[in-house]
Each structure stands twice: as structure tokens, then as C-alpha cells.
Amino acid sequence: MEGDLAALGGCASSASDDDGYGDEGGRIVCGRCDRPANACLCDALPDEPIRLERGCGVIVLQHPNERKRKLATVPVLTKALGSCDVLVGRKFRAGQEPVLDEAYRSAREGGADVFVLYPGPGARDLAREVAAVPRRPWTLVAIDGTWQQAKEMFKTNEDVLLPAGVPSARRVSLRPPEGGIRMPLRTEPERGCMTTMEAVASALGVLSDAPDLEPRILAPLAKLYGVQKGFSPSLKERAERGIDYKGSRRQRLVAGGGDGGGDDDE
């Protein structure tokens, strides 16, 4: 979609190649945030991607189908956070992903922690875990996909993510955000679910000593959410009305105007 480029806030006012814009499928696309020009996020992105403290990082295991979604939040996350590696696939094996292997090598040697962010029975509260262990390097592992895809990926890769004999690799969960869902780009299956970017930012807010880290990471997501409300009547309705979690999953999806894992488009 073409928009008024002069009104985009930190972006150029023409569509020439020199201005950082390209043409993708007939739409003008920003060369920095890779979003359509009239949905540009650049004025909410940090000048340089945020770097975490030495020895710390984020690994996102992304379902292949998630790359196709226009409102996937991980591409926005990687624009804001420099210390983030994205591995695409359904099944991951030891010895095939260097960044994953290095994180678990350090954990086996007892010099670092691995926190696998996946809620449910058996997950420990991240804030309590951080308070109980000495400060040392860590890696946060998150799964990116629809709720069903994430469930299947965790089950398939559980032996790799939580290997026997590595107590410093553990499954953790976040405390529900105050006020419930903050930016429901999708119709969540139950209260407390968040987008991948929200979950990672919230976890980093617990793991890091920097009090402004979480809001800095979430700024471009808030911009994306605000822009999309203007394009999507169903998203605007969900934001204004909230989501009723009392009905069946099907009733919630119909009421929310979503498919439980799809995206509203701009």
C-alpha cells in the first residue's frame, strides 16, 4: 500500500532507492524495518540494535510457517535487539546448530544458565529462578509459532532443550502481565498469552539489570500494534472490547475475529 511518505516520521519523503525504500509486490517497503511504507516502524526502533551484557543472548526457535506471516513479531524483535539469533525449523539436533550448541556447552560446564521459556506444568517462575542463582552469563530460548506449533516443537525438541544431567538448563515461565494481554495481535487461546516479542521482552526485563530494557524493546511493537488497529477492524474491536475467555475456544476465535494463530493484515 502506498501512503503519504512525508508524514512517516523518521523516514524519507520519497520512494527512490537512495532513500532506503524498495518496491515489493507493488508496495513501497521501508529498507530498514522491512515494513510497508505506510506502516513504517523506524521512528520507534533504537538507533542501533540493543546489545545485552557480555555472554548473554536470546535464541528464537521459529516454526517455518511463521516466516510467512505479515504480523510475525520476531522480525521486529531482531530489528530492536542485536543479541538475538533466529533458528528456523521444526526439529533441532545437538551438533547441528553452533549457537545452540555453544549455549548448552557452557551450561554443561556450569558457567552459564539456559532458560527455556515455555509455560505450563513443570515450568519454574523465571523471577524466582533469577533471584535464587548467582549472576552469570545466560541464554534465553523462546519458541515462535502458533500456540499449537509451539506445543509440538517443545515436545519434539524437549530432550535437546532440557537435556538430562544439565540442571542449569531449565524450563521457565513468566508471571501474567498486569491488566492481561497488552497487545493482542492474534486471538490468544487463554488469558496471559503474549506474542513472542512481548514474552522475550518481558523475560529480558527480569533477567537484565537495565530497568528500561523491556520498554525499549517493546516500543516498535507498540507502534506496530497502533498502526495495525487502523487497518484491522477486528483488531481494533478486540483492543476496545477485550477478549471473553469464558466461552469455548471456537466461540473466542469467532468473537475475536481471528484464527488462533493467523494474523490480521494491513
Pin down the residues of each PLM region.
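Short, flexible, mixed-charge glycine/proline-rich loop motifs
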Residues: 17-25
